[in-house]
């Protein structure tokens, strides 16, 4: 069940269906309430102590969660919509076992479902979990730490922590940070670094741990010097811009000018609220410089001129015997030069000079254990600067100092000063990964580490946490190593293992990682599309590795895999199977085929393991004929190879065909697509034959069929029931047991009454399909009723019902709901063993099923995707969020052309159309750019890239800096660096060649000069290639031949295109303002291309228990149990901290949810503290201009305002608006929301004219995207009326308020509170307008102003009323609603569903109850602190989500 429940939740979160989670978390929730609730509460306290350790201080980062623990039960507040969840791992990872329980062929299906993933569903170990959680909460040890020369430090630690983490804590604190070589002693016994604190017998509350300085070794001395260097350049953002050491940027502190929590409330009249020019409505191209504010002052003071290893290294023999370890050379700010010796006791100045070696100590000698102490002693300016750096470092938020899990690259960078740095130089040329790699054995055995961590025990919660933490740590290190290695390979810094072969056939091993290039080396992919197939194969292989890792079958192993795109080349990095290099592949493979099915092998152990995995992945076991015409059984695609390593482990590799092929992009002889698809232009012949369907699609398809199956069965059962009723009157009873047996057969189970389980499963499924959930639920009730009535039916009739339903939905089995796919069904050259017609093994049936799944994608999923975005509830902001949304619906990006065609006919989806067109242009350009880069010498990289950017983004002169003759001259003797230059190129090569035919299958043996010579590319030729690529790859006519026409026709911003393209291909440009309209000189010069960085694809490991806690917490929130929800989500955050450390995308999702809950529970200060951490985390982990970061900024601005930081709230909104416009332009529904917020706050500050500009823009956008009959439009009219009335323009105000009133009256009725408020507003405005008119008339008649006329008094709104309005705009509406009302709503809904009432009747019923609850003030049984969030359907939340009316509406 674990995976299954997770899958449901993941489904709900991915599709943004706020209602789905409740039902699908049922199992978990019941377990938690029954057995585990008492244990869940203490979890936040452990999170506290954890964060103490992670963050190095117990204040900024851990306050909120800690405070919550003691909070009285403030009784529940509003449900947070589920879309927040996306706690999936960022790869749209739905779990693999979604339907395993209900439609497995084997009787023991359920046992198998649970086996592979003991990973953490509470029901998997209901008995053991109590002990686990008790163990988890054994926390809160307070110890004193005594360091030499520093005050005793008192810290609270978690018993789960390792001693090593106290080391880390001390190295992070200001007073002890300069120590690295020390041990920790308790009662004179040295503590083991890798021991858990709870394992230390004599450690108790109040114990004192002593820090004891240890003698240095060569390694420790090097570590110390590196640490000193890191401390000195801690404030320097250069590493973050260069993409080194997992450093990244955050600008929240710069924007808020310090910690928000330390700020005093601001008086409205003291706020500077003028928006910068670039955030006011109407900006055409936003500037680039504000993206990185305060760049000039980012770097701290300089403490030393030079700190480097000395040229006198290493110490000669005699000096080694005196204990010398290494020599350093230092130039201080006072221009003094020193040579320093490191010995086992510490550091001292020696008497060497640049010319003479004299290692004796200087006179007077000063030996310091810490290099910082020695430098402070010899240089006063060092001492001052170091103190300043330390102060600034410790003032920064803890999250600003921790390394990110993976490197985040910046696409724009200022000019960086290049300083002398010996350690950086050493890192660049050493083959190791830096000092942390100096472990026994020197190079790491990545494969052994990756597989051993997966083999760790996982029975109990602490074991699973340890296992997941180890997997995550090793995976992170592997990704870092693989990325470095791939760059070294392309830069020509690694020797090939087959140096004699053609450069593009070369393979490499570096640091125990195997690297191969994305070319078709031995015509392996010749039949499948050559280089184009070879280029995409690693990506499909990575998808396969991901899903097999998610299933996690014990005994089945995959390789560590990372795919890196760098400088136009695709490099695959894999861990090495032990023994694989010692034998030929033919001897190694014991399962699968190495020649696409000509020879096929099978192996009983592999069949057993893959059969288990296949149940989750919906892979159908099938038989194929080998070269001797013998049938061979397979449980995977033919290409999937099984190799037993020298370590005895069963490895699978080449998983590129894990999922069935996409017949819409294959031209096949024996496939006839439906008329609708043919009319839409399918099949489109793709340039490779590896296209396959996504896992999300298969899950949605099976879910859809299951709903149909239940419906059809229900109809037949009702007919049977009617027949039985008539028979009953004749009095022919049948034994009840027989009927129950028959009914249970619906689920394909034997003699077990599974109908309840089946109905629950169906409820879960039905709820996660938004459009059909209500009818499906009605059907479930019908089938329940029918089954109970049919208890008297006989087995034969029930079996007949199931048989008919199976036939109707196209099940593989006649008498059972069974949907699995044969991935080889259309593979060329494979001979299948055809089974009997109508059985699972019938090839015709398998083909039809794959065809139907592909048809389902086009006819159901694409319309569902568009329908979901019609509400603009969580609109994509850039190409990445659009791609994620498409993937969550199971739609591949190759369907983007079809999606654009549909969006182009819908004016209300204009913004999405523009984002999609931009993404398509960027992807088409990427294909061309990769080939272009492969044909460029390293000497000309910056000139070639700037030339390409000029051709893409400008119409001005694009004279390349290198003449074409010179380029040819260089090309003749191109050096090693570019030896991978392909004669065929990578993906996207075919469209470059003038000879290439329409379907991209040109021979590609010779490059035309237009391709081989980058200097000949012009804006016109590049855009022609982009148009051609759009047509060939996406079957879409791009109607523009230059950037100008793209801008005018599609509304694309050049700066947005520059950002998207740089991020997609890994270019870093100089941070400056670019004049794209320049007619006299090229926009981009050589110096504007600062760097190229790798684009890395890998599988991020998951934290299963945290995920379960999170989804259970969401279920609680949806039921209105906010306190319990808060505690569960705090628990999830605590577990995430345990697995991932302090910084991770998923931690950010938890923080955002906790902040929202705190706000709804009435604790705005708590919300502010937590949300501040969420913003910093998103900036650092996702990127400064990532869509999530914009979302976090808008949330933070609301909580800032609620805390009285009015000016700060505006600054945060200005930042969010700037980033929005930079990414996608002003024409976007989310900009309307931000503008409404800005307008309201400006209005509160009395800046009416500015306020009016923003609200007018918001109204224009709301009218465009929501139509005139929508809540956001009514609110915009009302806000506009408020602002105009304050300006004295009562006539306009009156007209606008009338619009609001007419909307409320027609949509909500005359007696609704909002309608009455609007009517009152109209009355006051009319009164003021009449009064003003009377005054004007008096003035006109008398010709002069009279002094006795009373002035018109305009009251500015109170801050409280502004906050209420902000909550309304952002979809947070606080309503008092009692438990009695909830019961009423629930019974009302059930009644309507039974009667099969239309949806709008149900909504009316809910609205009337909620309205009644509101009008009665506090209803019976109402707790004054009972707060419910009710967001009208269509009202937008800040984060662009839709909230359900109440818990009841989600049932």
UniProtKB/Swiss-Prot annotation:
Q: Where is the composition biased (Basic and acidic residues)?
A: 748-758
Q: Which CDD domains match?
A: CLU-central
Q: Where is the Clu domain?
A: 424-666
Q: InterPro entries, from UniProt? A: CLU-central, CLU_dom, CLU_N, CLU_prot, GSKIP_dom, GSKIP_dom_sf, TPR-like_helical_dom_sf
What is the role of the protein in this entry?
A: mRNA-binding protein involved in proper cytoplasmic distribution of mitochondria.
A Gene Ontology molecular function term for this protein is:
mRNA binding
Q: Which UniProt keywords apply?
A: Cytoplasm, Phosphoprotein
Record lineage:
Eukaryota, Metazoa, Ecdysozoa, Arthropoda, Hexapoda
Q: Which organism is it from?
A: Drosophila yakuba
Location comes to: Cytoplasm
Read off the HAMAP family from this record: CLU
Mind listing the GO biological process terms from this record?
asymmetric neuroblast division; intracellular distribution of mitochondria; mitochondrion organization; ribosome localization
Task: Please classify the protein's predominant subcellular localization into one broad category.
Answer: cytoplasm
Which residue windows does the record flag with biased composition (Low complexity)?
9-53, 989-1010
Residue ranges with Basic residues bias: 66-75, 969-984
User: What Gene3D superfamilies has UniProt attached to this entry?
Assistant: Hypothetical protein (hspc210), Tetratricopeptide repeat domain
Region annotated Disordered, chain positions? 1-101, 264-286, 722-775, 961-1012, 1413-1451
Q: Does the keyword Amino-acid biosynthesis apply?
A: no
Q: Which PANTHER family match?
A: CLUSTERED MITOCHONDRIA PROTEIN HOMOLOG, EUKARYOTIC TRANSLATION INITIATION FACTOR 3 SUBUNIT EIF-3
Post-translational modification Phosphoserine, affected residues: 270
Give the protein family: Belongs to the CLU family.
Q: What is this protein called?
A: Protein clueless
GO CC, alphabetical = cytosol
């Amino acid at each position: 069940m674990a995976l299954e429940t997770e899958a449901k939740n993941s489904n709900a979160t991915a599709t943004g269906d706020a209602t789905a989670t409740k039902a699908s978390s049922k199992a978990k929730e019941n377990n938690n309430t029954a057995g585990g609730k008492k244990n869940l509460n203490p979890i936040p306290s452990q999170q506290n102590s954890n964060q103490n350790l992670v963050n190095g201080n117990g204040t900024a980062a851990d306050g909120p969660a800690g405070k919550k623990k003691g909070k009285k039960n403030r009784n529940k507040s509003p449900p947070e919509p589920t879309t927040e969840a996306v706690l999936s791992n960022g790869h749209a990872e739905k779990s693999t076992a979604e339907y395993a329980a209900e439609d497995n062929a084997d009787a023991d299906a359920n046992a198998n479902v649970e086996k592979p993933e003991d990973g953490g569903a509470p029901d998997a170990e209901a008995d053991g979990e109590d002990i686990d959680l008790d163990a988890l909460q054994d926390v809160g040890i307070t110890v004193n730490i005594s360091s030499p020369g520093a005050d005793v430090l008192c810290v609270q630690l978690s018993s789960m922590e390792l001693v090593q983490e106290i080391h880390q804590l001390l190295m992070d604190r200001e007073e002890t940070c300069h120590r690295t070589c020390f041990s920790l002693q308790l009662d004179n016994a040295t503590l083991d670094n890798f021991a858990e604190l709870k394992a230390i017998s004599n450690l108790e509350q109040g114990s004192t741990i002593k820090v004891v300085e240890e003698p240095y070794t060569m390694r420790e001395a090097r570590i110390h010097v590196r640490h000193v260097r890191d401390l000195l350049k801690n404030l320097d953002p250069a590493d973050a811009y260069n993409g080194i050491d997992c450093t990244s940027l955050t600008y929240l502190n710069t924007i808020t000018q310090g910690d928000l929590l330390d700020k005093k409330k601001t008086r409205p009249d003291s706020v500077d609220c003028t928006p910068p020019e670039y955030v006011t409505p109407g900006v055409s191209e936003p500037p680039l410089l504000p993206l990185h504010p305060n760049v000039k002052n980012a770097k701290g003071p300089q403490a030393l001129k030079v700190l480097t290893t000395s040229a006198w290294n290493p110490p000669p023999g005699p000096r080694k015997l005196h204990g010398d370890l290494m020599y350093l050379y230092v130039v201080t700010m006072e221009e003094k030069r020193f040579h320093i010796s490191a010995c086992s006791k510490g550091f001292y100045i020696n008497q060497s000079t640049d010319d003479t070696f004299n290692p004796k100590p200087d006179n007077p000698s000063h030996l310091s254990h810490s290099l910082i102490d020695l430098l402070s002693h010899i240089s006063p300016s060092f001492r001052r600067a170091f103190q300043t750096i330390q102060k600034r470092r410790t003032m920064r938020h803890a999250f600003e100092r921790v390394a990110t899990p993976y490197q985040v690259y910046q696409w724009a960078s200022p000019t960086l000063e290049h300083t002398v740095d010996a350690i950086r130089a050493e890192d660049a040329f050493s083959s190791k990964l830096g000092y942390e790699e100096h472990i026994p054995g020197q190079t790491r055995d990545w494969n052994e580490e990756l597989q051993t961590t997966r083999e760790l025990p996982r029975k109990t919660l602490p074991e699973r946490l340890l296992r997941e933490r180890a997997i995550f740590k090793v995976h992170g290190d592997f990704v870092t190593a693989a990325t470095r290695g791939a760059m070294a390979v392309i830069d020509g810094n690694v020797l090939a293992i087959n140096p004699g072969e053609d450069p593009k056939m070369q393979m490499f091993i570096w640091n125990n990682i195997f690297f191969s290039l994305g070319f078709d080396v031995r015509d392996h992919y010749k039949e499948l599309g050559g280089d184009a197939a070879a280029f995409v194969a690693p990506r499909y292989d990575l998808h396969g590795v991901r899903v097999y890792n998610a299933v996690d079958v014990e005994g089945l192993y995959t390789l560590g895999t990372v795919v890196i795109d760098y400088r136009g080349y695709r490099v695959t990095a894999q861990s090495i199977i032990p023994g694989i290099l010692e034998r030929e592949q033919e001897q190694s493979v014991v399962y699968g085929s190495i020649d696409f099915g000509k020879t096929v092998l099978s192996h009983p152990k592999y069949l057993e393991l893959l059969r288990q995995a296949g149940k989750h992945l919906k892979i159908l076991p099938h038989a194929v004929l080998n070269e001797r015409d013998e049938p061979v059984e397979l449980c995977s695609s033919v290409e999937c190879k099984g190799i037993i390593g020298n370590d005895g482990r069963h490895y699978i590799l080449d998983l590129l065909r894990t999922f069935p092929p996409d017949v819409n992009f294959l031209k096949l002889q024996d496939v006839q697509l439906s008329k609708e698809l043919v009319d839409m232009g399918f099949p489109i012949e793709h340039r490779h034959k590896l296209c396959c369907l996504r896992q999300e699609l298969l899950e949605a398809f099976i879910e859809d069929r299951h709903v149909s199956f239940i419906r059809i069965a229900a109809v037949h059962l009702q007919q049977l029931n009617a027949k039985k009723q008539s028979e009953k009157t004749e009095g022919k009873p049948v034994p009840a047991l027989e009927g129950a047996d028959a009914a249970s057969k619906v689920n394909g189970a034997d003699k077990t009454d599974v109908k309840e389980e089946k109905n629950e499963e169906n409820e879960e499924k039905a709820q996660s399909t938004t459009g059909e959930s209500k009818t499906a639920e009605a059907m479930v009730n019908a089938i329940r009723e029918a089954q109970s009535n049919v208890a008297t039916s006989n087995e034969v009739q029930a079996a007949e019902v199931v048989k008919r339903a199976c036939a109707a939905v196209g099940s593989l089995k006649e008498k059972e709901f069974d949907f699995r796919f044969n991935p080889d069904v259309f593979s060329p050259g494979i001979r299948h063993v055809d089974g009997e017609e109508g059985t699972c093994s019938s090839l015709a049936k398998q083909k039809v099923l794959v065809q139907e799944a592909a048809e389902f994608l086009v006819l159901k999923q694409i319309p569902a995707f568009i329908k979901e975005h019609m509400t603009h509830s969580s609109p994509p902001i850039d190409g990445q969020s659009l791609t994620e949304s498409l993937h969550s619906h199971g739609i591949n990006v190759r369907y983007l052309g079809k999606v654009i065609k549909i969006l182009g006919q819908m004016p209300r989806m204009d913004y999405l159309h523009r984002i999609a067109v931009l993404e398509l242009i960027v992807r088409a350009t990427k294909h061309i750019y990769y080939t272009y880069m492969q044909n460029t010498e390293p000497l000309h990289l910056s000139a070639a890239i700037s030339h390409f950017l000029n051709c893409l983004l400008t119409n001005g002169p694009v004279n390349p800096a290198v003449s074409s003759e010179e380029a040819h001259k260089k090309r003749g003797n191109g050096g090693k660096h570019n030896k991978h230059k392909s004669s065929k190129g990578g993906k996207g090569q075919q469209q470059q060649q003038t000879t290439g035919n329409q379907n991209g299958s040109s021979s590609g043996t010779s490059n035309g000069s237009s391709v081989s010579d980058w200097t000949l590319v012009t804006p016109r030729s590049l855009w022609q290639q982009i148009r051609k690529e759009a047509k060939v790859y996406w079957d879409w006519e791009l109607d523009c031949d230059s950037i100008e026409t793209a801008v005018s026709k599609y509304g694309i911003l050049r700066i947005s295109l520059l950002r998207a393209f740089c991020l997609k291909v890994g270019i870093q440009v100089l941070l400056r303002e670019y004049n794209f309209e320049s007619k006299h000189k090229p926009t981009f010069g050589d110096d504007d291309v600062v760097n190229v960085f790798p684009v890395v694809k890998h599988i991020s490991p998951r934290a299963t228990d945290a995920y379960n806690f999170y989804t259970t917490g969401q279920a609680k929130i949806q039921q209105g149990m906010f306190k319990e929800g808060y505690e569960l989500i705090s628990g999830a955050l605590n577990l995430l901290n345990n697995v991932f450390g302090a910084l991770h995308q998923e931690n950010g999702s938890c923080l955002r949810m906790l902040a929202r809950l705190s706000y709804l529970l009435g604790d705005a200060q708590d919300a502010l503290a937590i949300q501040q951490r969420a913003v910093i985390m998103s900036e650092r982990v996702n990127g400064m201009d990532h869509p999530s970061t914009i979302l976090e900024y808008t949330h933070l601005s609301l909580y800032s305002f609620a805390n009285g930081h009015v000016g700060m709230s505006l600054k945060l909104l200005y930042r969010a608006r700037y980033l929005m416009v930079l990414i996608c332009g002003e024409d976007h529904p989310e900009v309307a929301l931000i503008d409404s917020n800005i307008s309201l706050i400006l209005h509160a500050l009395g800046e009416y004219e500015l306020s009016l500009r923003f609200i007018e823009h918001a109204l224009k956008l709301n009218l465009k995207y929501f139509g005139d009959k929508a809540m956001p439009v009514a609110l915009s009219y009302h806000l506009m009326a408020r602002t105009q009335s304050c300006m004295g323009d009562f006539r306009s105000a009156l007209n606008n308020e009338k619009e609001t009133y007419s909307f409320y009256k027609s949509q909500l009725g005359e007696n609704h509170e909002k309608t009455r408020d609007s009517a009152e507003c109209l009355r006051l405005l009319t009164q003021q307008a009449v009064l003003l008119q009377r005054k004007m008339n008096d003035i006109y008649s008398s010709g002069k102003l009279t002094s006795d006329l009373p002035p018109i008094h305009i009251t500015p709104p109170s801050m409280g009323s502004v906050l209420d309005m902000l909550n309304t705009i952002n979809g947070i509406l606080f309503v008092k609603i009692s438990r009695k009302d909830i019961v009423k709503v629930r019974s009302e809904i059930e009644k309507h569903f039974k009667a099969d009432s239309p949806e709008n009747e149900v909504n009316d019923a809910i609205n009337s109850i909620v309205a009644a609850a509101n009008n009665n003030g506090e209803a019976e049984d109402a707790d004054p602190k009972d707060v419910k969030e009710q967001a009208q359907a269509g009202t937008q939340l800040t984060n662009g989500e839709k909230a359900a009316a109440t818990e009841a509406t989600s049932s």
